[in-house]
């Protein structure tokens, strides 16, 4: 019966170790080594999946909430003193602008009239229209009636000697020249006389226009 010696077993182990060495140059050995490496990597991955906690296999909503919480947590860590100062400065700026916009909104617009209908009346003291009926106006009706007469008295071309009121006439005044025969006529005579017989060349009628 043949027996293996101790030296032969040692040589066999050495040969086995040589065959499993990384310094193999043959193409077949390289392919086998690659397959063994892939097989070992798959085993490692399988063990890792088996050791994974069941909390990781949650629903998509839970995953989204968890991821959002983690993002918020990470972003909160980025807030430093400079960012906080900028934030408070921006908030104060927004509040100031909001207060200014509120004041502008409450203030009356220049193009928008805030007066009542009574203030828009010509006789009102708040009226923006110049009127002879206004209390602040120093121009009276008497001045308006005699304005033309005073202007004509200042000139040499035409003089006003008398203003006579005539009944049944649309004219307010009859202006007579110096050479007119109606200069000395009394009011009673004019009332009784026929207006058609008056010398219209020496007198003229005028009317009063209100603006």
Curated annotation (Swiss-Prot):
Q: Does the keyword Phosphoprotein apply?
A: yes
Composition-biased stretches, type Polar residues, lie in 26-35, 53-62
Disordered: annotated segments: 1-73, 96-123
List the biased-composition ranges (Low complexity): 63-73
In this chain, where does the modification Phosphoserine occur?
182, 186
What is this protein called in UniProt? Uncharacterized protein YBR071W
- In this UniProt entry, the residues modified to Phosphothreonine are 184
- What is one term from the GO cellular component aspect held by the record? cellular bud neck
Give the species this sequence originates from: Saccharomyces cerevisiae (strain ATCC 204508 / S288c)
Q: Which UniProt keywords apply?
A: Phosphoprotein
């Amino acid at each position: 019966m043949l027996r293996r010696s101790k030296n032969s077993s040692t040589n066999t182990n050495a040969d086995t170790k040589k065959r499993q060495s990384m310094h193999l140059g043959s193409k077949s050995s390289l392919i086998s080594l690659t397959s063994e490496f892939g097989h070992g990597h798959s085993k490692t991955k399988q063990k890792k999946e088996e050791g994974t906690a069941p909390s990781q296999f949650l629903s998509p909503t839970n995953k989204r909430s968890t991821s959002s919480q983690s993002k918020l947590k990470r972003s909160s860590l980025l807030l430093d003193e400079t960012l906080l100062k900028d934030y408070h400065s921006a908030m104060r700026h927004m509040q100031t602008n909001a207060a200014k916009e509120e004041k502008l909104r409450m203030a009356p617009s220049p193009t928008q009239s805030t007066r009542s209908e009574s203030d828009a009346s010509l006789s009102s003291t708040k009226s923006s229209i110049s009127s002879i009926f206004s209390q602040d106006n120093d121009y009276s009706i008497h001045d308006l009636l005699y304005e033309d007469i005073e202007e004509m008295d200042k000139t040499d071309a035409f003089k006003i000697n008398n203003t006579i009121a005539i009944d049944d006439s649309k004219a307010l005044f009859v202006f007579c020249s110096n050479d007119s025969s109606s200069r000395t006529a009394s009011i009673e005579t004019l009332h009784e006389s026929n207006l058609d017989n008056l010398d219209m060349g020496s007198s003229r009628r005028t009317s009063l226009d209100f603006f």
